[in-house]
């Protein structure tokens, strides 16, 4: 800029740098503010500051004409995608709706099916295949194009059964080698390994027009 403009900078350039500088200082202050709210058990402070790092920009928002972005308090999301095309905004909504349920199930073999952030079926059985089939039986029509979330490491027999239905995303606490080989035959199917994902009790923020 200095060379290009004979030792000076444009107003547009200075405004851009100001935006970067104030964003960084505000981000730092927000972390401190939220920390003190937390240790003082202030659940609903008079002013709430939201902060996060830009993680990803999905192709579009809830609808094709809308934009969206994914932010996280961490430098990356603790969500490991191991196969398939890019996650969409709606995929993220469905994934966390499914995980909210599956991560809260007992440590038995549980399966959750979600479509448009609504549960279509939930089941706990003695083996993986029974668990999935029981969850699917709750609403087999709505399950088409939905998301399956399992609280166990997936094996071959369930993978073969899942491949019979069109699904957007499959989530599990890991996949064995044979299950991965089978599921990866569908190049667009998104596979999520949620083994290390820990769910905590959190406040949920809902936007209404420009309000929260």
Task: Annotate each PLM feature.
Residues 1-44:
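N-terminal beta-alpha lobe that positions the nucleotide/phosphoryl donor
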Residues 27-32, 36-212:
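ATP-dependent carboxylate/acyl-activation modules
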């Amino acid at each position: 800029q200095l060379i290009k403009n004979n030792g000076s900078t444009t107003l547009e350039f200075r405004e851009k740098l100001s935006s970067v500088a104030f964003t960084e200082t505000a981000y730092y202050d927000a972390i401190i503010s939220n920390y003190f709210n937390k240790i003082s058990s202030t659940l609903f402070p008079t002013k709430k500051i939201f902060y996060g790092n830009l993680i990803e920009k999905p192709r579009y928002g809830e609808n094709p004409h809308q934009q969206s972005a994914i932010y996280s308090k961490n430098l990356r999301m603790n969500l490991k995608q191991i196969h398939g095309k890019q996650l969409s905004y709606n995929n993220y909504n469905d994934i966390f709706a499914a995980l909210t349920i599956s991560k809260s199930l007992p440590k038995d073999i549980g399966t959750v099916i979600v479509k448009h952030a609504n549960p279509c079926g939930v089941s706990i059985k003695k083996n993986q295949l029974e668990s999935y089939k029981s969850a699917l039986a709750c609403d087999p029509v709505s399950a088409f194009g939905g998301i399956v979330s399992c609280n166990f490491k997936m094996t071959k027999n369930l993978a073969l059964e899942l491949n019979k239905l069109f699904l957007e995303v499959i989530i599990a606490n890991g996949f064995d080698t044979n299950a991965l080989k089978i599921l990866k035959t569908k190049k667009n199917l998104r596979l999520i390994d949620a083994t290390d994902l820990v769910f905590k009790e959190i406040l949920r923020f809902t936007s209404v027009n420009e309000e929260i």
